[in-house]
Amino acid sequence: MTSDSVGLHGLWVDLLMPLDANLDIHHAKLYTHIQTLAVKGIAGIVLFGPSGEGDAFSCDERIDAIRQLLDRGISAKDMAIHAAFPTLRDSLKLIEQAHAMGVKCFIIHPAFNNRDATDAGMVAFFSHLAQQLKGQDLLLYLASDPCAGAHDLNNRVISQLLAQHRDQFEGLIDQSHNASHTLDWMRAFEEKLSILTTQDMNAKVMANLGVHTGISSYANVIPALMIRTIMSNQASKRSVTGEAIDVDGQLLMAFDQMIMSMPAVPALKYLLSIQYRDPDWNRVRPPLSLLNSSTHDKLLKDFQKFNASAAP
């Protein structure tokens, strides 16, 4: 994974988080999963994002996981850390302690439980972070949070932050599933910031626009397909009539349709438990819950069919 490039480039994986029987992070299995993905050619890892059940882990748990990965030999420059908490102190603590261990890339997004939060309040929140971290060698990415609803990051807040702290933000990460929203951000801000998406089904659209960087949850299970999708903007085959056939696009659509009606994290963890032949991967932290047995059975059959169609 290690490269000399600065910031997010190529395919970064929003890592699923393996848990032990006590629902604590299983650090050894996390390391092994990262090593497996690295062999497949991913560019880096995102820790404690939506697929990593980030909101379920405390600041100290996140710091401990980073430390253990570094001790096992994972490079700090191959990590991007979700550092959003409802409290400024926790966000600052995580960023400062991880940065002291060599990590430079951090993702922050609205984490407000207060329904009275305002644009001015969001600007003040992120401005305080920017002021406290000013002068440090950091890469800060602002991210949307669809769960924030009306209090999500919006163009007004972004514009004010750029006016006040332009040099401190590296890019914008759209965590919505709305391609139009991502394109709106590109039109408004691409001359000032890099614009990325975490929506796997939008990766092809971004690649066709020349953006060959993205954060993927599906890459936990299908890394090779996601790498090809992000790095290519051409159909891989042609029909007998010369018409372009997007084979990888068809495979990605099939994978998406397989799990689209299910909660994403439990579904992906179940698929990974099948792939690794390790039932321990099939654990989530409440308030998430596992898929029921009938859903498991259907998903297993669909995944076997998918793997057969994806085989070279």
Region spans (language model):
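Broad structural signal for hydrophobic residues in well-ordered alpha-helices, predominantly aliphatic
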Residues: 129, 161, 185, 271-272
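Soluble or luminal CAZymes and related metallo-dependent hydrolases
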Residues: 29, 61, 121, 177, ...
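Active-site beta->alpha loop and helix N-cap motifs at the rims of alpha/beta catalytic domains
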Residues: 2-152, 169, 288
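A general structural signal for well-ordered alpha-helical segments in protein cores
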Residues: 62, 66, 91, 126, ...
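Catalytic alpha/beta core domains of metabolic enzymes, predominantly
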Residues: 134, 145-262
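C-terminal alpha-helical cap/extension of soluble enzyme domains
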Residues: 7, 12-16, 40, 211, ...
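A structural signal for short hydrophobic/aromatic patches embedded in well-ordered alpha helices
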Residues: 65, 161, 299-300
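Short glycine-enriched loops at secondary-structure junctions
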Residues: 85, 200-202, 274
